[in-house]
Every structure is written in structure tokens, then in C-alpha cells.
């Protein structure tokens, strides 16, 4: 089973030419991890571009996410089969529940047990969740048992560090993928990150990514520009001191970028 590469290509809000620019250039530069979702409405294009790239499917770690409309009894697996068809593949590396069911409209056990069944049937190699609170993560572990939930994908960056969620995941061996790791570009203007970057000869964005990577997280920034895609990859080589790591931790201010009206409290 392929291990998830620590740096991936996020595809949220990318379609048409921007998606083409991001994926084809990214794969050419050496990215081997693509993150998409049913609600992004770009799975078919992602599949086409993966095929066009010439990179063998088995060399790409592919994640998609099941949308909340597909949680009801008997719906999760057919929705993943549609995703697989669009993506032009017969398996996913990771299938995630995109958000917990709004207001618990569908009981968690209903959709998580279907997701586990999708794994048992070979539709996906690993399963996980996204945007779950600590209470919801506890419930998920109780439903499926220890070790079943392999990943939690959640918004994390220096301005929103989600420490309680991170601690819970670490204690339960749940790997973390940080989405929006640059806070929609807000981190680029942070004086502390710029100052640390100058010290290392790198950008504030690279410092933000390096800070997350140093904590053992996977990051999935999105970019359509070749120079930014290459710079994000180069963040893998940035080594921050323990003092710098601690300084960056002081930037926490609960600044959430992804906050739809159905998000859990």
C-alpha cells in the first residue's frame, strides 16, 4: 500500500485550465498526491489529467471525499463507485467523509459503517474523516474501533492551530492532513514568518508549510503557477529550529477560513 506523500496538490475551487495547470505541472515537478472531492465537481477532469500526465496510477496517492448528501443508508458506496468511474480508476488510496452530517441528520454510524464496507470491498485502501471535532472523532473511533480511521483532514495553519484536534489524532494514531495551510495567503503577510523566512532564504509560505511538515502533518496547498508549485515542494527541505517552531506557535488566533453555516461547533 502506497504511503501518503507529505505534500499534495489540493484541487478545491480548481476547474478547467487552472486545474490543468496545477495538476500537469505539479505531476511533472514530482508531486504524487492529489486531493479532490465529490463536491468540487472536478473528479472527471482530475481523472482525465492523471491519465494525460503519463504518471502510472499506482504512483499517485489519490483522495476523494464523500459529500453530506450521500450519507443515507445505501448511498455511500454507490457515490464512491461514481467517483471511481469519473476518476478513471478502480480504487482510491483514501476516501474521507467530507464533513460530519449537518445537525446529525444522518446518524454517524450509518455513514461510517458504509465507508468501512467500501474499504472491505476494495474501493478504497484507507478511510478517514474531515472537519470532525474532538467529540466527533471520539464517536467515530467508538463506532469503527481503534485503528479504523486512518486520517483526519482539517484546516490547520499558524493562525488556526486546532491543537485539541491534533492532540487527539496523535494519541489515536490518526494521521493529519492540513488543508488551507497558507490560510488563503494570509500567512504571506505575517511579519514573523517573513522574518524567519529571510533567515532561511525562503518565503513566509514555505515557512508555514515547513512548520506543519515538521509536526508530521501532510499539507495540500493549491497553486496553478509553476514557480509556486516548485516553491511548495522545496518547503520539504526547510528545517526550522525548535525556537522558531515555538515562535510560530504563538501566532494562533482562531482565524478560520473554511466556516460554512453547517460546520460543527
Functional labels for PLM-detected ranges:
Residues 14-27, 72-87, 108-110, 135-138, ...:
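Short, acidic/polar
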Residues 57-70, 91-100, 155-156:
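A short, structured active-site edge motif that brings together acidic residues
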Residues 44-51, 80-84, 115, 137-141:
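Short, well-ordered amphipathic alpha-helices
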Residues 6-17, 65-74, 103-105:
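Active-site mouth loops of central-metabolism enzymes
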Residues 1-60, 114, 183, 264-265:
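N-terminal binding-site loop/beta-alpha segment at the start of enzyme catalytic domains
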Residues 76-97, 117-121, 143:
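CE4/NodB-like, metal-dependent polysaccharide N-deacetylase domain
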Residues 33, 91-94, 125-126, 151:
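Residues at the N-termini of beta-strands
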Residues 100-265:
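Beta/alpha (TIM)-barrel catalytic core signal, keyed to glycine-rich beta->alpha loops juxtaposed to Asp/Glu
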Amino acid at each position: 500500500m502506497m504511503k501518503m506523500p507529505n505534500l499534495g496538490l489540493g484541487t478545491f475551487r480548481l476547474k478547467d485550465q487552472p486545474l490543468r495547470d496545477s495538476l500537469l505541472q505539479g505531476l511533472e515537478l514530482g508531486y504524487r498526491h492529489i486531493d479532490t472531492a465529490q463536491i468540487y465537481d472536478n473528479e472527471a477532469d482530475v481523472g482525465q489529467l492523471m491519465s494525460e500526465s503519463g504518471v502510472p496510477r499506482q504512483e499517485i496517492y489519490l483522495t476523494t471525499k464523500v459529500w453530506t448528501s450521500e450519507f443515507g443508508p445505501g448511498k455511500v458506496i454507490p457515490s464512491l463507485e461514481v467517483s471511481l468511474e469519473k476518476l478513471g480508476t478502480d480504487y482510491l488510496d483514501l476516501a474521507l467523509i467530507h464533513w460530519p452530517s449537518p445537525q446529525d441528520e444522518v446518524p454517524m454510524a450509518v455513514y461510517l459503517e458504509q465507508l468501512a464496507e467500501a474499504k472491505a470491498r476494495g474501493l478504497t485502501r484507507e478511510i478517514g474523516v474531515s472537519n470532525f471535532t474532538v467529540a466527533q472523532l471520539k464517536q467515530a473511533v467508538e463506532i469503527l474501533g481503534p485503528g479504523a480511521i486512518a486520517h483526519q483532514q482539517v484546516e490547520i495553519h499558524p493562525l488556526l492551530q486546532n491543537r485539541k484536534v491534533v492532540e487527539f489524532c496523535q494519541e489515536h494514531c490518526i494521521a493529519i492532513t492540513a488543508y488551507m495551510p497558507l490560510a488563503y495567503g494570509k500567512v504571506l503577510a505575517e511579519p514573523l514568518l517573513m522574518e524567519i523566512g529571510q533567515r532561511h532564504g525562503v518565503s513566509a509560505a514555505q515557512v508555514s508549510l515547513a512548520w506543519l511538515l515538521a509536526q508530521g502533518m501532510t499539507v495540500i496547498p493549491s497553486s496553478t503557477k509553476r514557480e509556486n508549485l516548485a516553491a511548495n515542494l522545496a518547503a520539504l527541505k526547510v528545517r526550522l529550529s525548535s525556537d522558531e517552531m515555538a515562535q510560530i506557535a504563538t501566532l494562533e488566533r482562531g482565524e478560520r477560513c473554511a466556516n460554512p453555516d453547517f460546520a460543527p461547533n
